[in-house]
Amino acid sequence: MSAIRYELIKKCKQSGARLGRVYTPHGCFDTPAFMPVGTQATVKGMSPDEMKEIEAQIILSNTYHLHMRPGEDIVKEAGGLHGFMNWDRPILTDSGGFQVFSLSDLRDIKEEGVTFKSHIDGSKHFISPEMAIKIQNDLGADIIMAFDECIPYPADYDYAKKSLERTTRWAKRCKDAHRNPEKQALFGIVQGGMYKDLRQQSAYELLELDFPGYAIGGLSVGEPAEIMYEMLEVTVPLLPEDKPRYLMGVGSPDYLIEGATRGIDMFDCVLPTRIGRNGTVLTSKGRIIVRDAIYARDYTPIDPECDCYACRNFTRAYIRHLLKSGEVLGIRLTTWHNLRFLINLMKKVRQAIMEDRLLDFRDEFFSKFGYKKI
């Protein structure tokens, strides 16, 4: 029996979007959903209670970083991630593949796995598909990911094909190594670069392995938005209707809405926390850099339409002052706001799906935010 169950509640008559709910051992979450990223078993600047206040239903943690520090053995002793970080709602862990291929000084990719140098101290490490699953079994998240190879953009066709076929073999090894399928759902990850036929090949090969959910990886890595949408349009229709679909590493408002219109259920990204730390905030009328001098005497909220703690209590002028003074509260408030903005955006997306008006909502939002339709 699978650790999770996907319930399809409604299909949007105006688009390919769907309203759903995913049930896990630690409760359910509504889809389409944005998952805040807690890389080091914490969403930067936010406590678990604050994450609940902004209505985060599920968060993501990072296998690579937790393996490096403090080590999965410590997390397991503490009662898994849920006990370690005192979070009683669903958690998803990535496999560490993306970090191994992007952060580390790569040494060698072989069929057995990947040898790499730590980004912390330069020490040499090896991760195989079996090890990635063992680490995630110890971390204890509700949803875990197969170990995949993340190729750069651009990549030539032959390498993309060779890589996706290795990713399929690794996915089978991950499934064979998984020791806790009744408590942790293992998702396969579709790869294939920016080639339609390779994306289709990857999807078909993973479908044969019958995972409880499917992710689409290797997108939003520098390619034009039109290409990402093309890859979604050839991949998503191949994925099972009765299982969740997860677009990895995507979190800008336009990508969230466009992904939802194409049938994606789950998204994650560090964008809201990362840009918040740099003084950039998302508003219903577009991004603003609140630390800029223009806001020194702006006594309005970050976004008058937002209901978050920062917008209910503080002004742009005050938050700018905090950021310019190097006060931690400034970063906390911009982070709080950005996370709430995206979580609330997904609530509006779900409501628009329920009312069969997602494309209308998209057009209205894009017009106010300053996006162009592609």
From Swiss-Prot:
Belongs to the queuine tRNA-ribosyltransferase family. Zn(2+) binds at C306, C308, C311, H337. GO terms for cellular component: cytosol. It catalyses: 7-aminomethyl-7-carbaguanine + guanosine(34) in tRNA = 7-aminomethyl-7-carbaguanosine(34) in tRNA + guanine. Binds 1 zinc ion per subunit. Homodimer. Within each dimer, one monomer is responsible for RNA recognition and catalysis, while the other monomer binds to the replacement base PreQ1. The keyword Lipoprotein does not apply. Pathway: tRNA modification; tRNA-queuosine biosynthesis. It comes from the Bacteria. Its EC number is 2.4.2.29. It is an enzyme of class 2 (transferase). This is Queuine tRNA-ribosyltransferase. It comes from Acetivibrio thermocellus (strain ATCC 27405 / DSM 1237 / JCM 9322 / NBRC 103400 / NCIMB 10682 / NRRL B-4536 / VPI 7372) (Clostridium thermocellum). Its cofactor is Zn(2+). Catalyzes the base-exchange of a guanine (G) residue with the queuine precursor 7-aminomethyl-7-deazaguanine (PreQ1) at position 34 (anticodon wobble position) in tRNAs with GU(N) anticodons (tRNA-Asp, -Asn, -His and -Tyr). Catalysis occurs through a double-displacement mechanism. The nucleophile active site attacks the C1' of nucleotide 34 to detach the guanine base from the RNA, forming a covalent enzyme-RNA intermediate. The proton acceptor active site deprotonates the incoming PreQ1, allowing a nucleophilic attack on the C1' of the ribose to form the product. Keywords: Glycosyltransferase, Metal-binding, Queuosine biosynthesis, Transferase, tRNA processing, Zinc.
